[in-house]
Amino acid sequence: MKKKIAIIGSGVAGLTFANLIKKNSDFQFMIYEKKESLSLDDGFGIQLAPNSVSILNTIDFHKVNSKDIFHPKSMDFFSIKNEKICDLEISKFNSEYSKYTTLKRSTLIEFLKDEIYTQHLRFGKSIKEVTELKGKVLIKFTDNTNDLVDYVVGADGIFSNTRSFFEKKKSQPLFKKAIAVRLIFKKHNLDINEKNISLFMGSNLHLVIYPINQKNELNLVCIIRDKKYDPDNIKSLIERKLITQNSNLKDLFETDLQSWPLYSTSKVLPSSNNKVFYIGDAFNGFLPTMAQGAGQSIESAYELFNLIKDENLDASNIYFKKRFERTTAVRRRSNFNFFAFHFSSSFTQKIRNFFLKFLVKKKYFINSYLGSVYKN
């Protein structure tokens, strides 16, 4: 009898896992999403390093229209005043078919949903109760439906509701006293190469700009340290924290802005049930300062898929150990970047910039710091 999997959440992690299961196994599966629909509006950009692109290629990512993606070759580092510090060639981590890729998140979701939307995705589904029954997991939903499955895969984000039903130990995400602000634009007065990723570092903030398709659209994300999140006064925050450091940036933010508070996982905890797994941000939520959020969601889905596909009897322990080691390495780099990008004094900024110019030329350091993540 075919084994059955319930996937809770239809983000990048859940959809990637579902595609892997559909294409490469005979497991039955269903995705349960608490929202009423997938959000496919033109959204913000994401970055995919070769490590995640190689996985997506196993489910035909190469079929995505080339006009809807971009392959930046370099990352340019600037002061917040738009003074160039140095650059780093990121295309060195590419292989023939797996290249550093930027695109809209909605483009990725659109691709991932195509093969599973009709038969394998149910909306408006919130868990009400879970029980174990004859070696399986019985999930009861608030709409009075239920499902009896062999495995449950929690892919419902950093504030995972799935965890609250299965885990006694709690690990609340930590507010990092920082805000993310995003927008998409075309026209600007900045001195940048629009084909590259541009990173601007200022006092208690940084700003990243990169192309997301072949239509001259650029994604901008600004990370600003602030003690509280006030969504009604984001433009005031931008004016107070960013524009005072570079008034030339003002025009960029005179449009509709998306914003949210930044959280990260405080402590990574294993599943207490060998039939229940967590992937993506439900396993570990990162700061965006390593651009590995989507990448690690894809990686975690792939790691778990291979263990479940082979029906590994020790899948729970093997998965947690490998994923914990991997996320620890990425989290350390993300946290360090969050620290180094935001130096507030001109003295520490000059020291950082000096070492940055030196380190980007050191092949061993770059392979250790970035290559170990990008090429895994």
Model-derived segments and their meaning:
Residues 13, 37, 159:
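Conserved Rossmann-like nucleotide-cofactor binding loop
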